[in-house]
Amino acid sequence: MPMISILCSLFPPLLFPSLLAAFGASIAAGIIGSYIVVKRIVSISGSIAHSILGGVGIALWLQYQFNLPISPLHGAIASAIFVAICIGNVHLKYHEREDSIISMIWSIGMAIGIICISKLPSFNSELSDFLFGNILWVTPQDLYFLGILDLFIVATVSICHTRFLALCFDEKYMALNHYSIKTWYLLLLILTAITTVVLMYVMGVILMLSMLVLPVSIACRFSYKMSHIIYIASILNIVCSFLGIMLAYLLDLPVGPVIAILMGGAYSLSLLLKRSYNASTPSPVSPESKINS
């Protein structure tokens, strides 16, 4: 295929596993990022993302201390889903302030992770990889697992897209049609948790929100339709990720920060393009505005 030939000519074979992981992460981030920006739960996503470090640290410690066959990816997915369910239930059932819950979980998750990783002989390198991303250490087993997670996200959203739109824009409609708001809200948080685990391999724990939020914010400037926003955000993620991997490889830099800088540059460019946008076109949609499906 022409596209594969182009990629083979541009990227060395060593980077192909990293490119596959970045492609899957870009699709997941473009899809889920669109919902969390419109639903205004970016801060919750940040809490889930940072709490991953706790699961990663526990998995690495168990692996080192007891020689258990536990991957950091397994610890990350378990902690992310657990935190997502906890945040959702506390918010919906007890109506506690979200900012208080987020602050508590954010700090506890990071603290547990740092304590566990500090007990490892390779503390600095492991911590740097998970905080700032190092997609070059993706193994074939991790790649298969990431592919399964990505397919699950795409399949679930394809089936439940209408319900998620109603959750984001019209919860009264869901209640009138006897749909469980709690169930769909928790499902969205779980999908967000899975997405953050996928992004951990590309961006690291600290910088993954830039891949979730910035491309969606750019797309929202130029389209009303939710489906268009998802497509644009996914394409922007793919372009910035591939370019970031190549630049990081050539310049011997960490991948996550390079991609984050490219995302920031793309967002700044969108601000300039916004000024030259056709004046007769209605104002682009904002994350808070109602978006059509």
Curated annotation (Swiss-Prot):
Where is this protein found?
A: Cell inner membrane
- Give the transmembrane region(s): 18-38, 41-61, 68-88, 101-121, 135-155, 187-207, 242-262
Q: Which GO terms describe its cellular component?
A: ATP-binding cassette (ABC) transporter complex; plasma membrane
Task: Report the domain of life of the source organism.
Answer: Bacteria
Q: Keyword annotations for this protein?
A: Cell inner membrane, Cell membrane, Membrane, Transmembrane, Transmembrane helix, Transport
Q: Which Cys-Cys disulfides exist here?
A: none
InterPro entries associated with the record: ABC_BtuC-like, ABC_TroCD
- Statement: the UniProt record of this protein carries the keyword rRNA processing: no
Q: Does the keyword Secreted apply?
A: no
One family from Pfam that matches here is: ABC-3
| SUPFAM superfamilies listed in its UniProt record | ABC transporter involved in vitamin B12 uptake, BtuC
Family, as annotated = Belongs to the ABC-3 integral membrane protein family.
Q: What does this protein do?
A: Part of an ATP-driven transport system CT_415/CT_416/CT_417 for a metal.
User: What is the name of the protein in this document?
Assistant: Probable metal transport system membrane protein CT_417
